[in-house]
Amino acid sequence: MTATAPRSDPATSIAMTTADFGRIARSVQDEFGIFLPEAKKDLVYSRLLKRVRALGLPDFAAYCNLVESPAGAGERTEMLSALTTNVTHFFREMHHFDLLRDKVLPPLLHAARKGARVRLWSAGCSSGQEPYSLAFTVLSLLPEAARHDIRILATDVDPQVIDRARNGIYAAADRDTIPAPMLSQFTDKTPDGLRIGDAARALISFAPLNLMGDWPMRGAFDVIFCRNVAIYFDAPTQERLWQRFAGLMRPGAHLLIGHSERIAGPAEASLENVGITAYRLAGQAPEKPNQTKAERAIA
């Protein structure tokens, strides 16, 4: 018997008990690091009820059995898509892109012209507006960027949004947040909105990646954007994430985080605040974790 009455749908008599919610919350946190407090129970119920119905399951207990099973990997991804909201736009938190344009990118691109390797990472890229904004900023400073060793990695835990991001097709409303010169130079107008141009596409590699899992990247990053992602994690998970980022950054590299996020834990000692939610790796670069042969093969 549960401590509180189960949340239920009168039309179908499908209820979600406190025990069901606890199982779902554990699955989401174990798999994706996302913390679901009790206050989110109604939201979880309303969003996952659609999945229970679509699968023809009798109740949430059966749904929990599915997502907890080895055969439920695909449904765990569907569950994540149902529970997360991908709200973003081009050049969100413009001050970060101003910092890139004015201070961070000029020395990096100068080095790239001389043969240096430059790597940027949009971690939790959602539907792609962030990495494309990075590409536009790079191209505005170095139009021939694709001829140099400059690459942007864009990852998200949700394969469905990665597919949308890779497609690079956006609605007319998305035009409003792109500076006019960049809009004309780096996008193509379509009847319903815009298409990302080839110059920006050439700089970006999209890939699904769970930040709670292994990171099969080699080499160090010069810039990491991970904004409005860590807010879904509990404090210990956030601290581990900041430390892992620091371990993949070059000395002097920058980490940009969301407006409601703060660096805490061991990474505080090596990440110096240099602006609004902007941090620079100070001192010597942390040693990189050991990599497998397969990991070393991924650029």
Give the role of each language-model region.
Residues 2-121:
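Conserved AdoMet
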Residues 123, 144-225, 229-240, 262-264, ...:
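Extended basic-aromatic, gly/pro-enriched interface segments that bind polyanionic ligands
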Residues 264-299:
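Core SAM-dependent methyltransferase catalytic element
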Residues 252-259:
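Conserved beta-strand signature within the Rossmann-like core of class I S-adenosyl-L-methionine
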Residues 100, 224, 249:
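Residue-level signal for inorganic ion chemistry
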Residues 101, 135-139, 246:
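A structural alpha-helix within SAM-dependent methyltransferase catalytic domains
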